[in-house]
């Protein structure tokens, strides 16, 4: 009987020590972590997250920025954002992804994939919108912005991942054009996403061949 009681006590002690060790490890690992996604540094959500990394801050200095929360992903390059209690439709600047919900043409290849990828990055998350030097809206009344979330430039991430191409290039809304073009170049060389479909991207005119439906 004494041996049995002793065994129970030892087991209980081991379990308690394991729980304490696990708790301590969790506490020590609660600092913001960093990871790399498709070559672009991203910051896992945590206390000391910087919305816009220093390298971008220098280039974007003086441009208007606003904070908001993503309400809805409309497609791969358009989102609805709550800004100070008002819903704003935002088009990701310098980016064009294949159509997934257009009423004018059938859904295109990679359109749904682009929307899903963007949703995974932004749905329900806080973002910082950066407006460039030129017009802040397009002809449809959508805001034109660089979108940052947890230290990631989302426009650039979409291009680098092959879910979109660089398009609608109008000065002076071109502050981050070099970074966007470099991201697109890497996706093209890797034959990622839209670049994996032969003849899909019309590079000269910077649009998609619309007859390539999903």
UniProtKB/Swiss-Prot annotation:
It comes from Bacillus anthracis. It holds the Pfam family SNase. The active site is at 91, 99, 142. Residues 1-24 form the signal peptide. This is Uncharacterized protein pXO1-141/BXA0211/GBAA_pXO1_0211. The keyword Signal applies. Residues 64-197 form the TNase-like domain. Keywords: Endonuclease, Hydrolase, Nuclease, Plasmid, Signal. InterPro entries: SNase_OB-fold_sf, Staphylococal_nuclease_OB-fold, Thermonucl_AS. Transmembrane segments: none annotated. GO terms for molecular function: endonuclease activity; nucleic acid binding.
């Amino acid at each position: 009987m004494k041996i049995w009681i002793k065994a129970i006590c030892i087991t209980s002690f081991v379990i308690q020590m394991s729980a304490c060790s696990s708790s301590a490890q969790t506490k020590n690992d609660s600092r913001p972590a960093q990871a790399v996604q498709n070559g672009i540094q991203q910051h896992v959500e945590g206390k000391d997250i910087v919305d816009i990394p220093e390298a971008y801050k220098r280039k974007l200095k003086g441009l208007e920025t606003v904070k908001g929360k993503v309400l809805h992903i409309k497609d791969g390059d358009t989102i609805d954002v709550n800004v100070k209690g008002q819903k704003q439709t935002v088009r990701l600047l310098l980016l064009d992804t294949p159509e997934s919900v257009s009423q004018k043409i059938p859904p295109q290849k990679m359109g749904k994939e682009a929307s899903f990828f963007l949703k995974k990055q932004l749905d329900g998350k806080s973002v910082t919108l950066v407006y460039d030097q030129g017009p802040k809206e397009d002809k449809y009344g959508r805001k034109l912005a660089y979108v940052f979330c947890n230290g990631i430039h989302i426009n650039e991430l979409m291009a680098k991942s092959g879910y979109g191409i660089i398009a609608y290039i109008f000065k002076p809304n071109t502050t981050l054009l070099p970074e966007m073009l470099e991201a697109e170049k890497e996706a093209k060389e890797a034959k990622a996403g839209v670049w994996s479909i032969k003849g899909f991207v019309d590079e000269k005119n910077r649009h998609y061949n619309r007859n390539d439906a999903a």
